[in-house]
UniProtKB/Swiss-Prot annotation:
The lineage of its organism: Archaea, Methanobacteriati, Methanobacteriota, Stenosarchaea group, Methanomicrobia. HAMAP family: CdhC (MF_01138). Its EC number is 2.3.1.169. Belongs to the CdhC family. It catalyses: Co(I)-[corrinoid Fe-S protein] + acetyl-CoA + H(+) = methyl-Co(III)-[corrinoid Fe-S protein] + CO + CoA. [Ni-Fe-S] cluster binds at C189, C192, C278, C280. This is Acetyl-CoA decarbonylase/synthase complex subunit beta 1. The gene is cdhC1. Pathway: One-carbon metabolism; methanogenesis from acetate. Part of a complex that catalyzes the reversible cleavage of acetyl-CoA, allowing growth on acetate as sole source of carbon and energy. The alpha-epsilon complex generates CO from CO(2), while the beta subunit (this protein) combines the CO with CoA and a methyl group to form acetyl-CoA. The methyl group, which is incorporated into acetyl-CoA, is transferred to the beta subunit by a corrinoid iron-sulfur protein (the gamma-delta complex). GO terms for molecular function: acetyltransferase activity; anaerobic carbon-monoxide dehydrogenase activity; CO-methylating acetyl-CoA synthase activity; iron ion binding; iron-sulfur cluster binding; nickel cation binding. Keywords: Acyltransferase, Iron, Iron-sulfur, Metal-binding, Methanogenesis, Nickel, Transferase. It is an enzyme of class 2 (transferase). Its cofactor is [Ni-Fe-S] cluster. GO terms for biological process: acetyl-CoA metabolic process; methanogenesis, from acetate.
């Protein structure tokens, strides 16, 4: 579009600005990044106004990372507070329409980059702000007036961040007393399909969106004001399994929106047909087979989990709209759900959390488990995690003994099977050679133990070993 120094089109959704082509980075894992939309009286809004508090684009150094906050104020006859998070989630859409400007994540995890090519065409964030507001008012006509303030001053960004977190907390609390069984419809969201084409985000009262920005009420408000938009109704259909959270309606939409890639999504399962994971998720869960437990790591944690992998690596192999057994992306508020991974043990299966995340969701953790869940201060690897869980008598420890007994039983069964093998009748014309007995005090015999193995043998030759002279 001629009035802006960069092209604007949905074709730029999914465009990545790589580090080598980046002019500046805004927010992200190395700094603070925030976006917030607030409903306001029409008289309090100066339409299309862009305010910049802190260094503007022309004042920034190439290759540097800066703190970043975007506060949008919207007004209109139909605008109400219930629409704030709905409009807020479309920020991701419309910023990515702008060529050379990459936007990832949401709320207090925003990560943006401006390319060198785009920065060469504009020296201020003002045209960028005006372009985004133009897109909002074009696509969402219930917004009659809009203004935006960009913050790049660290102190100001921190101040806005604290205020915003309280607002987000109040929004999320609205679904506390509403549950999956209380409603007839869930809501779907396809905003992340530009980056994760097969992702099917299902929002229910007991399961917030993976990005953490859309709860059930937000989905309802969005579908009402923008029926053709990215949020829409999903008829629940028949309940197939109350524990896993499997519904016929969800399975149908999963198959349709993933182009047949998946035919089942179980809302509250970690292992069996789990919810797909996009890339905007706030937290990723990972199975730790050595302790039969599940750990969780969020974007803010910069260290390694006990499995020796960091968030970014796990996110890379979990995201993309896939169902990866052993990994699961979620929104932070799902920790507060009474149905939190209930098909696989719920909180009794959680063994590790980063200390800051554990502190953040303290109210969600059952009182009897708070001191039994390790953090990086208690366990940095599998061995130290196992020792911690044993010392605290975590619920997963009880499963270890059962697993060992099962292994012993399997070994005994295998020994019996091997011992019985020579008694089988050989095929006609075949002479089974005599097996040499071991000398000395040994009782002789053969023990073969196969665990989790599938073996196909075309031919087996048993011959006497001749001593070398």
């Amino acid at each position: 579009m001629a009035e802006f120094p960069f092209e604007i089109s949905p074709m730029f959704e999914g465009e990545r600005v790589r580090k080598e082509g980046m002019f500046v980075e805004l927010g992200g894992p190395k700094s603070l990044g925030l976006e917030l939309v607030r409903a306001a009286d029409m008289d309090a809004i100066e339409d299309d106004k862009v305010t910049i508090i802190g260094p503007d684009l022309k004042d920034m150094e190439e290759g540097k990372t800066y703190p970043w906050a975007m506060i949008f104020n919207i007004g209109g006859e139909l605008v109400e507070p219930d629409l704030e998070s709905v409009v807020e989630r479309r920020v991701h859409d419309f910023i990515n329409y702008c060529q050379g400007i990459m936007h990832l994540n949401q709320r207090y995890d925003v990560w943006m980059r401006v390319s060198k090519d785009t920065a060469a065409k504009m020296d201020s964030f003002e045209p960028f702000g005006k372009a985004v507001m133009m897109l909002f008012k074009t696509e969402l006509p219930f917004i009659e007036k809009m203004q935006v303030t960009f913050y790049t001053d660290k102190d100001e960004v921190e101040k806005q961040m604290e205020t915003a977190k309280e607002i987000f907390k109040a929004r999320d609390a609205r679904t506390k007393d509403l549950h999956d069984e209380d409603v007839e419809v869930f809501y779907g969201c396809t905003l992340c399909q530009s980056f994760a084409p097969t992702n099917v985000c299902v929002v229910s009262p007991d399961r917030i969106s993976l990005c953490g920005a859309i709860n059930w009420f937000d989905g309802r408000a969005a579908a009402k004001v923008d029926p053709e938009g990215p949020q829409f109704e999903i008829a629940k259909g028949d309940l197939l399994d109350a524990v896993t959270g499997e519904y016929t309606g969800v399975n149908e939409i999963a198959k349709k929106l993933s182009s047949g890639e998946f035919d089942k999504i179980k809302l509250h399962s970690f292992f069996d047909s789990p919810h797909t994971s996009c890339g905007c998720f706030e937290v990723v869960g990972f199975y730790i087979p050595e302790v039969d437990g599940i750990g969780w790591v969020d974007r803010e944690y910069q260290g390694m989990a006990p499995n020796g992998i960091g968030f970014s690596t796990m996110a890379g192999q979990t995201g993309g709209g896939k169902q990866i057994v052993g990994f699961l992306g979620i929104g932070v508020n799902y920790f507060y759900s009474p149905k939190f991974i209930q098909a696989d043990g719920g909180w009794n299966r959680v063994v590790w959390l980063p200390s800051k995340l554990k502190e953040k969701i303290d109210e969600a953790i059952p009182a009897d488990l708070k001191d039994k869940i390790a953090t990086e201060n208690d366990a940095s690897d599998i061995e130290s995690l196992k020792a911690f869980l044993q010392e605290k008598n975590h619920p997963v420890v009880a499963t270890w003994a059962a697993a060992e007994e099962e292994e012993e039983e399997e070994e005994e069964e295998e020994e019996v099977a091997v011992a019985a093998a020579p008694m089988m009748m050989p095929a006609a014309g075949f002479q089974m050679p005599a097996m040499p007995m071991m000398s000395g005090g040994s009782s002789g015999g053969i023990k073969l133990t196969f665990k989790n193995a599938k073996i196909t043998i075309d031919r087996m030759i048993i011959s006497e070993k001749k001593e070398k002279k």
